[in-house]
Amino acid sequence: YRLLALPGTVDQDAGEVLPGQSGIDWSVLWDDGSQEGFLTEYDGSGTFNFQPGRGFWAVSKEGVNVASTFATVSLQADTATTIPLHEGWNIISNPFGKPVPWAAVDAANGEQLQPPFGFEGTFAQRDTLASAETGRAFYFLNDQGLEELVIPYPGAPRQADAPEPALAE
């Protein structure tokens, strides 16, 4: 298994991305963040659509090669985008075409975040969110009650009126 994501503004079912048939040629799992029974198997629902910032556990008999072009995500105040979160562990991705230093993400979200983990055979903390153009996604623990994660565009100045992270009620 690997953590898999797609870049940009995408809304595409995992079953349309991976070659072959679910359960035979590939498997996709979503982590709902709960303490037990947290991995949900692909069921064709919208939960399993690749969307900006969303990733999955995936395994495939064949390599995954997506030859589509995706529109870039929109920026808030020309500086950042946001991706939705749930409480607990989330599989996230960087929807931009450039890597984003985790220190910039942490600063944009109040500087209380734990670093994300990548998985390439073993889990390891990452100090940079590689672009989802690489197909990579990351595990992130939302233990701060965030409804969304602000991801600043690399090199964009932080503006005084840029949105603050939203806290769950």
What are these regions (language model features)?
Residues 1-167:
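N-terminal exported-region signature
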